[in-house]
Regions:
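N-terminal segments that cap or nucleate solenoid repeat domains
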Residues: 65-137, 455
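Bacterial N-terminal signal peptides
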Residues: 16-25
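Surface-exposed loop/turn positions within long extracellular repeat scaffolds
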Residues: 409-416, 429-440, 458-459
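Extracellular beta-strand/beta-solenoid scaffold signature
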Residues: 81-89, 109-116, 138-152, 170-178, ...
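Post-signal-peptide, soluble extracytosolic/periplasmic N-terminal scaffold domains
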Residues: 100, 117-195, 203-212
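Bacterial Sec-dependent N-terminal signal peptides
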Residues: 1-17
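All-beta strand scaffolds that present successive hydrophobic residues in beta-strands
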Residues: 94-102, 122-127, 158-163, 184-190, ...
Length: 460
């Protein structure tokens, strides 16, 4: 599919950078945590960039992604065979157990890394500076294998970094990248800042794992999510982090694997809060996250080869979730998805669409690319309309005192929409609504407030 490859851009998200300053600057002990969310990227006064931002011209094989997709233009990347990460080179390549403090790891050569941990080595690094400049020349290697990243973990290595500063100022320079089963990077009390396109904050592929705690991550480029997984799946666990993106197609979270985030403050200034592609997941708890573009969350399948087909999953509990976009709070297309919402505050000032399940011409085969969502709400207030097209379905299950204020399938276009209400859950209509079936534990129907509108149940 020509369309499929392009929006994958969304996933090329995470990290541009500032440079280090003198070693004395390492004396900082970064403190992060529950800072208020800001709509703009906060100034980074501690570190100054070592050089001007790279030339805006992208390498031949680095394809502009989200904007081209949105305008319908087709711009296929040149295919490349992914390289074996064991052949990658860098400033410091460590293959044996080692403990380091107060080090600098700088690299300015294209397709090299500042640091590589390999060969099942256990490596501990404290109070150090990592900086990367020099654009990637191979989009697939940098996105999927971690070439040209600042910090790379491969071959089952276990790398721990704390009290440090990680920056990049080049295209395709992810900040912290783990690839391959058993490869783990643990990072704590660290500042991360990337400036180039396709430069994510924490990234994992092919069953690699990155665990982050007490982090500040800022990305400025397009396709640069702060938390991301890509081809072959990967795992990201983030806790107590401040996350900010300012590039197009750079959500706070992009999952082609499994990403869990707890107690984060996140802002995507030109993108959605989060995106799940294929049989993968986002779990978000006790957090405050905001997106300014498109939808709140998108769950989809591109068939680009980066994500297995299956159920896309979103689980959100005890968060404040804000979308300033004009799309839907949850948009599902070309996949089957499940969303579990529990006790969240949902804010959507610029749209009245809570859920949209519909085909999208960018992905899938016409007539077969609808969205299919099961939405479970527990102790959850929901405000907004539920819409679906003729090849899409929505199933809403409300329990434990949940409420919906909105119209369901008001244009009667959906293939199928079903509702279940517990006795203590309520639905207040704001427009005529059409559903295939309605299961209500309150046999009197007193928990449904028609508000003067028509409710039509097909299977009655």
């Amino acid at each position: 599919m020509t369309h499929s490859r392009n929006y994958k851009t969304l996933r090329r998200f995470i990290v541009p950078a500032l440079a280090g300053g003198a070693l004395a600057a390492l004396a900082f002990a970064p403190t992060f945590g529950a800072e208020p969310v800001h709509s703009n990227v906060p100034p980074q006064n501690i570190f100054a960039p070592k050089a001007d931002a790279p030339n805006a011209n992208m390498p031949k094989n680095d394809v502009p992604r989200p904007d081209d997709v949105k305008t319908g233009e087709i711009n296929e990347p040149t295919p490349h065979k992914e390289a074996d990460p064991s052949t990658f080179t860098g400033t410091s390549v460590i293959s044996e157990n080692k403990t380091l403090e107060h080090q600098r790891f700088d690299n300015t050569t294209s397709d090299q890394n500042a640091f590589i941990g390999k060969n099942k080595a256990t490596i501990t690094i404290d109070s150090s500076v990592f900086d990367k400049q020099g654009n990637t020349t191979n989009d697939d290697n940098s996105n999927f294998r971690g070439q040209n990243a600042v910090v790379l973990g491969i071959e089952g290595s276990q790398t721990s970094i704390k009290n440090s500063n990680i920056t990049s100022n080049s295209i395709g320079s992810n900040a912290v990248f783990a690839t391959g089963e058993g490869s783990v990077i643990n990072i704590e009390n660290t500042n991360i800042h990337t400036k180039g396109d396709s430069s994510r904050g924490l990234d994992a592929t092919y069953k690699g794992t990155v665990n982050g705690k007490n982090l500040t991550i800022t990305t400025e480029g397009a396709h640069s999510a702060t938390l991301a997984t890509d081809r072959g799946e990967g795992t990201i666990n983030a806790e107590a982090a401040k996350l900010t993106t300012s590039g197009a197609g750079s959500p706070v979270i992009y999952s082609t694997g499994n990403i869990t985030a707890n107690s984060i403050n996140g802002v995507a200034n030109k993108s959605e809060i989060g995106v799940v592609e294929g049989k993968n997941s986002i779990t978000l708890t006790n957090s405050n996250v905001t997106g300014y573009h498109d939808n709140g969350f998108m769950l989809y399948q591109s068939f680009s080869g980066d994500a297995e087909s299956g159920i896309a999953r979103l689980k959100a509990e005890n968060n404040t979730l804000t979308t300033h976009g004009t799309g839907a709070f949850i948009y599902v297309n070309n996949t089957t998805a499940e969303a579990d919402l529990t006790g969240n505050t949902v804010l959507m000032p610029n749209t009245t669409t809570l859920v949209k399940a519909a085909a999208d011409s960018r992905w899938g085969k016409d007539g077969e690319n609808g969205g299919h969502l099961t939405l479970r709400a527990s102790t959850q207030e929901l405000n907004g309309n539920i819409v679906a097209d003729s090849i899409s379905t929505v199933s809403l299950d409300m329990t434990n005192g949940s409420s919906l204020v909105g119209a369901v399938n008001t244009d009667n276009t959906a293939k199928e929409i079903t509702l279940k209400l517990s006795k203590d859950s309520t639905w207040t209509l704001t427009g005529d609504s059409y559903v295939k079936s309605l299961t209500n534990e309150d046999t009197t129907g007193s928990n449904i407030h028609l508000n003067g509108y028509k409710l039509v149940v097909a299977d009655k």
